[in-house]
Amino acid sequence: MEALTTSRVVPVQVPCRKLSSLFANFSCLELRRYPCRGLVSIMNHPKLLRPVTASVQPHELSTLGHEGNIVPSKEILDLWRSVEAVCFDVDSTVCVDEGIDELAEFCGAGKAVAEWTARAMGGSVPFEEALAARLSLFKPSLSKVEEYLDKRPPRLSPGIEELVKKLRANNIDVYLISGGFRQMINPVASILGIPRENIFANNLLFGNSGEFLGFDENEPTSRSGGKAKAVQQIRKGRLYKTMAMIGDGATDLEARKPGGADLFICYAGVQLREAVAANADWLIFKFESLINSLD
C-alpha cells in the first residue's frame, strides 16, 4: 500500500499498572510433529501461565489532525451496530505489547527487532520480509519460548474484556487475526473466551531438540495481505453479511476490501500510526467508545 510507506508512528505514552484479578488456569503449549522429519511446533502443551494481566490508563490525547474520523458518521455507526463478526488484531490492540518485540527483548535482541516491527507495521517493507528478518535476529528456542510464556503473562488493553463480552452477548462472533505467534495468542484467547478455531496467526517451528527452525509460511498471516485473505476466508466460510476489522497497523487496514471487512476501526490507544489512522473509517483511543455505541 503505497500510501502507507511514509507512515509516522506516534507512541502513545501511557502509565501501566498490574492488576490482581485472577483468571482460570489454561493451557498454552503443545508439541506437534510435522510430516517433515525433525520438524516440531508448539501448540497446546499443558503448561500453566500465572493468571495475571496488566492494564493501562491512556492519557487524553490531541486528535493530531484526524478530527474527520474520530466522531463516526451515522453510516459508520450503523455499520458497526450491524456487524455479525469482529476481527481483532492482537499486538498493540487486544494486548498493549508487540509480542515479537517482547519475546525478542526477553531473548536479548529487543532494540533491533523493535526497529523492524515499526517498519513492518507502517507498511514500508513487506510483512514476510520483516517477520523473517526479526526472527533471524534472535532465533528463539522452544525452551526460551516456554520460559517467556511462563514469566510474561498477557497484558490486555483496557476495556477489551468488556468489549468482547458485549459483542458475544449480542451474538457477534469474535476472531483474533495476528501476524504474531499462535503460541503467544492462545493464552489471550483463553482469557477472552475466544475459541481456538477463531484464531488466525503464525506458528513457530522447532526441531526435535527444540532448536528454532523458522515459521510456517503456509499461514496466510505470514505475508503481506494475509490478514485480508484471512478475513475473506472467514466471510466466505461463515457467510457473514457485515464484518469489522479493528487494529493499529497497515496489515489491519488491508483487511478492508471487497469480500473482506466492511469497516476498519483504527485503535490508537497504544500506537498511533498516522497513515493508518488517516485511512480508517473510525479512529478510537479507548474501547469504551465501541462499547457505548452498542447500547
Curated annotation (Swiss-Prot):
Predominant place of localization: plastid
Entry keywords, A to Z: Amino-acid biosynthesis, Chloroplast, Hydrolase, Magnesium, Metal-binding, Plastid, Serine biosynthesis, Transit peptide
Biological process, per Gene Ontology: embryo development ending in seed dormancy; L-serine biosynthetic process; L-serine metabolic process; pollen development; root development; sulfur amino acid metabolic process
Knockout-associated phenotype: Embryo lethal when homozygous.
UniProt keyword annotation of Repressor present: no
Binding annotation for substrate: 98, 134, 178-179, 227
Induction behaviour: Up-regulated in aerial parts by 8 hours exposure to darkness, whereas longer exposure down-regulate expression in both roots and aerial parts.
Organs and tissues of expression: Ubiquitous. Mainly expressed in shoot and root meristems, vasculature, pollen, anthers, carpels and seeds.
A Pfam family this chain is assigned to: Hydrolase
EC identifiers of the protein: 3.1.3.3
Family membership noted in the UniProt record: Belongs to the HAD-like hydrolase superfamily. SerB family.
NCBIfam families registered for this protein in UniProt: HAD-SF-IB, serB
Protein's name according to its UniProt entry: Phosphoserine phosphatase, chloroplastic
Natural source organism: Arabidopsis thaliana (Mouse-ear cress)
